[in-house]
């Protein structure tokens, strides 16, 4: 993966590992390019936690999944995340077979932080891009003397 994708995936894993708010987790996921039909922040955050967080009792409930998918659905899943997600599922499947509750983001947290630490300028650049997208372009405003 290119450094940009490494950092974005690391930010997603860390947002889940550090139990950030739905908005922060969903933003990290959206920054990778995921899009959903209704753009539901709650759905995107739940989906990220389901993929990379610890297995929770509701994850084993078909009704929970049904309700989640009635709320929203994935329209585009980023290709850069496909292999990461598949690896996550394989590790979780192995852990479940061994009767372990394996949290991918918890296990990969140190490596995710390492990816961020290796690219500090890129992290700043991505944050500036995110701020610009959130706040709109910066406009020089005239100042008037009193």
Give residue spans per PLM region.
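Helix-rich C-lobe and terminal helical cap/extension of kinase-like folds
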Residues: 1-146
